[in-house]
Amino acid sequence: MNYFITGASGFIGRRLVEKLLQRQDSHVYYLILERELPMVEQLRQRWGNAANRTFPIVGDLTQPRLGLSDADLAWLKGGSIHHLIHLAAIYDLNASAEIQEQVNIEGTRNVVAFAEAIEAGCFHLTSSIAAAGLYEGVFREDMFEEAENLDQPYYRTKHESEGIVRREC
């Protein structure tokens, strides 16, 4: 099984890759920013011997096609990616609205378009309870449109990000 992950260097992503690598037939391709390349060796050490089944792909989810070349797209295309898992996001409540929109909204649009371009199998999004805004009480999956008080940029961008995936995937 082949996986493509955004956010693999983050808290959840590092642990998810570890779990996926416990599956003997798994290969994990992960998007990494160029400035994060020094982190690759640390990740490989964390993942141990199974790290030889991981493949860093330098790119940027804020760019169309994730900033990948035609050659990279061709290499990943054709159903070789069974699961695309989108974890990457700005989760800093103090980050500017502009950067949150760029990463959380436009980044998600770009990842969805990328998944379509490479003919990925299943698309998985790790969202946030913030997508509910300040809704009081129990908020179920089927209540997405009932989110309230999305004025805070993080809440709004996570809500819009999840909406993109709900509509397009």
Over which residues does each language-model region extend?
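NAD(P)H-binding glycine-rich loop region in Rossmannoid oxidoreductase-like domains
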Residues: 50, 54, 58-106, 118
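Active-site Tyr-X1-5-Lys
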Residues: 149-169
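Conserved Rossmann-fold NAD(P)-dependent oxidoreductase catalytic core, especially the SDR/UDP-sugar
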Residues: 86, 94, 98-99, 106-156
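Short, well-ordered alpha-helices that flank and scaffold nucleotide-derived cofactor binding pockets
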Residues: 18-22, 113-116, 167
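N-terminal Rossmann NAD(P)H-binding glycine-rich loop of SDR-like oxidoreductase domains
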Residues: 1-25
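Glycine-rich phosphate-binding loop and adjoining beta1-alpha1-beta2 segment
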Residues: 27-67
